[in-house]
Amino acid sequence: MAGPLDALDDPDYPAYTTGRAAEVLGVRQAFLRALDAGGAVRPQRTAGGRRRYSRRQLALAARARELVDQGHPVAAAQRILALEDDLAAERALTARLRRQHAGPGGRGS
């Protein structure tokens, strides 16, 4: 039986307000709004339109902050995040296809 706190274990649960997310990451709220506007980190919205961030989104925002701290403009950091996401998806697809090709015996033909 799922309890009311189980959602907090979900990395996609939108538990953080913009202010709290900014505080946790050590960034300004404007930085998070810029990531949202650029499409790099799209928080969920409440019925009233307020942003709510998940732990997974905080990790993406932290990576964007790391890239900006390295000297990349925000737009470049957003593009890098998108490319890293694409690469991860392609790697997962490649791994799945290799497993399928290997078949039940673990060897390819």
What are these regions (language model features)?
Residues 2-14, 23, 37, 42-43, ...:
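Arg/Lys-rich, alpha-helical DNA-contact motif
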Residues 17-18, 46:
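Ser/Thr-centric signal marking residues that sit
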Residues 18-19, 33:
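Residues within the helices of the helix-turn-helix
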Residues 28-31:
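Short coil turns linking two alpha-helices in DNA-binding domains
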